[in-house]
C-alpha cells in the first residue's frame, strides 16, 4: 500500500515536461484531479470540458490530468507522445490542454500514485455512484484490488480551497457538471 500523506498540500507530481508540481502552491484554490486517457470513448468530451472549466476559473481553479493506462490500455502513449496524441488524434483538431497534465502513473494497486492513495482514502467512492466498481474482472491488471479503487478512466476528485477533499465523481458524471460544486466551493454566485 502506498504511503498516505497527512495533507493534500504535502503531495506533488511531475508534469509532462518534467517539472515538479508542488501542491502546496494551490493554497486558497479549488483543485480538480481527473485520471485521463487519450484513447477512451469519452476522451473528446472530457478533455474539452476540462479545458472549459479551467478557462471559466483561470485563477481560482487548478485542473490536473493524470494519464493512466490501467483501464483497457487506453493511454498507451509514452509521456512525450501524449500531447501529440491529443492534438492530432483524439480530441484532435489541434487540441491543446489549458490545464496541467502530469506524467503517466498508476491510480490503483501496489504502485498507485500517492495522490490517488490520499484521495481514495478521503473519498472512498464516487458520490453519484457509490456502488461503482470495475465491471469486467478480466480487465483488472493491478493488485491488490480494493473497494475504493478508481473504476475506469475519467473519475474526478474535487478538493476545496480549504484543502478538504470535497467530492468524488464517477466516470459517467460529465466533467462540466462539476461547475456548480466548484462555484459553491469558491463561493461564486451560481
From Swiss-Prot:
Exclusively expressed in the stomach and small intestine. GO terms for biological process: response to oxidative stress. It catalyses: 2 glutathione + H2O2 = glutathione disulfide + 2 H2O; a hydroperoxy polyunsaturated fatty acid + 2 glutathione = a hydroxy polyunsaturated fatty acid + glutathione disulfide + H2O; tert-butyl hydroperoxide + 2 glutathione = tert-butanol + glutathione disulfide + H2O; cumene hydroperoxide + 2 glutathione = 2-phenylpropan-2-ol + glutathione disulfide + H2O. One of its GO terms (molecular function) is phospholipid-hydroperoxide glutathione peroxidase activity. Its EC number is 1.11.1.9, 1.11.1.12. It holds the Pfam family GSHPx. Keywords: Cytoplasm, Oxidoreductase, Peroxidase, Selenocysteine. The keyword Transmembrane does not apply. Transmembrane segments: none annotated. Homotetramer. PANTHER family: GLUTATHIONE PEROXIDASE, GLUTATHIONE PEROXIDASE 2. This is Glutathione peroxidase 2. It comes from Macaca fuscata fuscata (Japanese macaque). The lineage of its organism: Eukaryota, Metazoa, Chordata, Craniata, Vertebrata.
